[in-house]
């Protein structure tokens, strides 16, 4: 059964209220403390959260299905139990979506641009990640990261973000793995065909970094996660560049590609 990642996180919470709701990467290892300076945590008052990517001192990119009330955004976090001197908390001043109704599908427009209530400064643990200048190539090695469950379907929640490498496939691989996908899509298909490594649960909204370049946003995949032959889908950032850049430049009525 294919589920949007944040829905899977809600199910995990219902099954395990005693556990902390967080998100990690299955099959990964603890990220190097300096490799995720752009990675943000997004919480609401219930504690549920997604990931996101700082792309500018005032802007974060995440998934549309991560939209929530009372959003709190944390930057500069590594270990949940250890607060860095430069760790920051921000709120969403404005949120932008491709459609005014905030509709999206598993294969289209699952993207949200967040303007922070005030800018952040670069520091030892905080720095933005540049937007891509070119689309990624099939066969690229891509990096995934997050604070979520490292096991599925039962949840295990570490205190530090985990990172892992996966491969970028032709979109047809995901069409073969997941029923109902259209012939074309503004998404990227990535994973490990033998299984065992994957984003999962609430990893939604976090980055897919291919050959060192920010290329995708964690959107959705199979449940349980990390199953053989079931790569996940990621919103293709490159296709939304004009929309992102227009909004940041002040054209808040900019429209997404059809």
From Swiss-Prot:
Its EC number is 3.4.21.-. One of its GO terms (cellular component) is extracellular region. It is found in: Secreted. The keyword Signal applies. Its main location: secreted. Optimum pH is 3-9. GO terms for biological process: proteolysis. One of its GO terms (molecular function) is serine-type endopeptidase activity. It comes from the Eukaryota. Residues 25-249 form the Peptidase S1 domain. The active site is at 65 (charge relay system), 110 (charge relay system), 204 (charge relay system). Thermostable. Monomer. This is Snake venom serine protease BPA.
């Amino acid at each position: 059964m294919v589920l949007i990642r944040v829905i899977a996180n809600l199910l995990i919470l219902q099954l395990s209220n005693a556990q902390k709701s967080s998100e990690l990467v299955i099959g990964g290892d603890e990220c190097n403390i300096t490799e995720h300076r752009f990675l943000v945590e997004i919480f609401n008052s219930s504690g549920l959260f997604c990931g996101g990517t700082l792309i500018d001192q005032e802007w974060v990119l995440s998934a549309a299905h991560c939209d929530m009330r009372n959003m709190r955004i944390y930057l500069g976090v590594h270990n949940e139990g250890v607060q860095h001197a430069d760790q920051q908390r921000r709120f969403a001043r404005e949120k932008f979506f491709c459609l005014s109704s905030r509709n999206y599908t598993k294969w289209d427009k699952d993207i949200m641009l967040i303007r922070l209530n005030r800018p952040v400064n670069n520091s030892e643990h905080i720095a933005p990640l540049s937007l891509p200048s070119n689309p990624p190539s099939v066969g690229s090695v891509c990096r995934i990261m997050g604070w979520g469950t490292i096991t599925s379907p039962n949840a295990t929640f570490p205190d530090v973000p985990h990172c892992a490498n996966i491969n970028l496939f032709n979109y047809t691989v995901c069409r073969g793995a997941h029923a109902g996908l259209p012939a074309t899509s503004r998404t990227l298909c990535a994973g490990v065909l033998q299984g065992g490594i994957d984003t999962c649960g609430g990893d939604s909204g976090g980055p897919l970094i291919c050959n060192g370049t920010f290329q995708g946003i964690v959107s959705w995949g199979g449940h349980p996660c990390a199953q053989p032959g079931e790569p996940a889908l990621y919103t293709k950032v490159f296709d939304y560049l004009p929309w992102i850049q227009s909004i940041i430049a002040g054209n808040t009525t900019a429209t997404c590609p059809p």
